[in-house]
Amino acid sequence: MSEEKKVVLTREYVINLRRTREVSRTKRAKYAVGLIRRFVARHLKVEPKAVKLGQALNEALWARSIEKPPRRVHVVVEKLDDGTVRVELKQ
């Protein structure tokens, strides 16, 4: 049986994705995903591999194709008791 993982910490961030404009156009959305992972890992003191992006956030990053991700995203970050971190798009 799988038991619910307990949320230890919840925070909201506005992540600026301005740096994606410094990367070639055909790599921007993928770079934005990595940028979000590194940002959250740095702020919550976990490894980037432990950061899981939600489906709505991923769809928002890729909505205008690979070349034009948004300039900034509003996210809700939840750290679970097993050390993983969930990142969801703020509604």
From Swiss-Prot:
Keywords: Ribonucleoprotein, Ribosomal protein. The keyword Ribosomal protein applies. PROSITE patterns: RIBOSOMAL_L31E. InterPro entries: Ribosomal_eL31, Ribosomal_eL31_CS, Ribosomal_eL31_dom_sf. One of its GO terms (molecular function) is structural constituent of ribosome. GO terms for biological process: cytoplasmic translation. Pfam families: Ribosomal_L31e. One of its GO terms (cellular component) is cytosolic large ribosomal subunit. Belongs to the eukaryotic ribosomal protein eL31 family. PANTHER family: 60S RIBOSOMAL PROTEIN L31. This is Large ribosomal subunit protein eL31.
